[in-house]
Amino acid sequence: MPPRKSADEFFRRGREKGSEQCKEGINDSVVLKQPTDKSLRGYGRMVSLWNQYAKHHAEVNPSPYDLKYLKDFIKDIAFSIDGAEDDPNPAEGTVMVYWKQFTAGWRREYDPIPRNTTLSVRNFIIYELPEILTRESSLKLVKNKRPRRFGTKNHFLHLGRQLWGNDWVEYEKPATRVYDWAAHMAIVCSAARIGEYIESTSRSNSGRGLYYKEVTFGVFRNEHGNAEFAIQLVRDAKGMTHTPDKRPEHSLYEGLGLMPLICNPMLPILAILVAAKAFKDYSTLAELLAIEPADGEMLLLRWKDDILDQPLFKSTSSKRTTGKIETANAFGRRLRALGFRTGYIRPPTVHDFRAEGLYWIDKLYSVAQRMKHAGQRDPNTFNNHYQPNNSGTDGQGSYFGHDVRSVVNDLFRGLTLERNPQLSQSLPAEKQEALRTDPEFAAIEEELAVLLGQRDPASTARRKTLYAQKRSLVDRELRKWQKTQPNRPNPTGEDSAMPCYHRSIFNRVRFLMPERDRLASTLFETATLRSSTGLSALKDMISLCEADAEVEYRPGLEPQKCQCDESHRRRRKSPGAIQSSLNQQSTHDWRHIYNCFKKNSSGFTELCFLCNDWISGEFKWREHCRLHLTRPKTLPVQCDPLVYGGVLATAGYCVFCMSDTSLEPEARLRQFLDRGPWKAHVQSHFESYVQSADGGERVKCPHPGKHCSASFDSVGHLKFHLLDAHCRDFTKEPSALEVLKQEDEMLKQEGIIEPTLRKKRKCGVEEDAKDVKDKSVYRFIDETVRMAR
């Protein structure tokens, strides 16, 4: 052991290394803790609120070191807080957080508020503020926190079934669906927080999360002697920024036996890895499946060098730089929206699944293992914040000496998340009509009508504000309706009521997407990943990761049916013509192929949009239509033209024509390719139907299928039914763009407007039209048949 250096020698060595030249940052300034950007924003907001309070009370010159003014300030804060979920009452915890943010923010900029003063204000919030609120207003300070909710396996499966088996939302990239499910499964299986594999909102723009260089992937021979894939993930856990060596590690794997494929985390993760060509020594799925590891060892699969610094869960949004890590903000919004679509009024959160995961880890493992799994340092954190109030014990069974049961408590824990499988995704037509009569809503529409076409900055800003207010009103009414919506399961297991419009979309369009069509079935089968069913699902997920759009072409309108030369084939270049709900674009020009094939066919030919077959000859077309009419199950329930993925998925049909036996079959099944002519046609037939109805009888739904045999007391209720169940938006008023086109045509005939000006006017109003897209606007008169006549 070398001799210990003297003090002079010790510092001499430091001076030789440049100690005396390093003077920057050596001063008498107080060094403060470096919080996250999110925390700093919270501090700054509270200091600015104090400045506003002081400005409002400038006549008394309030001081933050005066207890009287601090109490008054925090009282004003409590009155100003908006409660959660339509509850106007502030929560004690929220007021306390605001107070702590204020004291922390003030301490960073000025002399700290004395500890006795801060403690007194804290006690004021707990003991005196509730009485002041109750005495001086109708508010009360809510002391209890929201009850802990638990994302049980059933809720996990409900989300999975919606995402893969019935989802009508089209993401910007098909890979988003795979990445989201992979991230969700990783979070669920490791009881992670939302920002530990992807970029947390508290660490915005930090790029922190899970990267390939921190991931270990291998193949081993399992207990049954079979090769099995496994992956180890490292969580960037909360509170471990300065102790990265302590971060929890979690392993996920294929599994030993049969399981529903939707529950296999290796399925979406392996799809991502294969699509990304992440492995250094293996480039295809077949090569990976052929690996035979040695007994008792894990064969490490190395990553490519150029992928080590890439995130495992990357963003697929065009709004972020390609390859950047996904953000908790974006992922959380999509998960929340998925929850609404699944039927939850209050959708499950990542933390709900974390709570359920920790519940099971606590039951099956030691306290030390649970703490490491959770990324917690205090053993009481679980008991205080995650342990269910229903401890899972069976007092009845244990007392009477019966077999103890756990299923009852598990199911009750699942009830902490309420779900309605038929939760409406939009207001019913009757509710929309009631909303239109609301004075606040009507005032917004009147002002929007006045601002239509005005392009000055002030009008544009005001219009955006009004549209936001309008959306807020609609959302508020929708939430009210959802809370009162009946939730009664049918004893037969079938839905007694017609499904809402949105829940029928996927079944109408799934034939356009072979991969999603197959996954909607295979993922819910019980199999292993290496079975034929599992490999089919894996290959379909890989295809989604590699695809630019979910819809490549429409069956019946394949690209080869275009008769043009290759150089003259029209392709869409950008999102500009027929668009989906996300303004996505398919390069497949279905309309050109449809017209081109018809034009170049000898004689009459028509595409049946119900069965995707071309029928040649008028007689054969008539008989084909007759065959559909004799088979009511083949007739569409929703009869509006539906564009999905940039192509026409289903043509529009008239419910009145379909039921009119006096017409020829081809007239009864007339196909509308555009919404405008379809709306005009159905509206005119509806008016004729009303005039011909017998005023003494109930009005029947004209749909010829066996799906619906409803009858109604009034024409208004029939119209509501048609809008909800069969002909969405057929009475919708003209859009802003349609109104402007009519005005331009009139001005053109009068010679008042030039073509270039018309183009400018059209471009100007397209923004208005975009804002009001999909916002149903109805004009109803609820009248009886006798009144209508």
Model-derived regions, located:
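Intrinsic-disorder/low-complexity loop/linker signature
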Residues: 224-225, 603, 695, 751, ...
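Low-complexity, intrinsically disordered regulatory regions
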Residues: 562-564, 571-584, 626, 671, ...
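Short, internal active-site loops enriched in acidic
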Residues: 318-319, 704-708
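Intrinsically disordered, low-complexity serine/threonine-rich regulatory regions of eukaryotic proteins
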Residues: 6-7, 502, 508, 515, ...
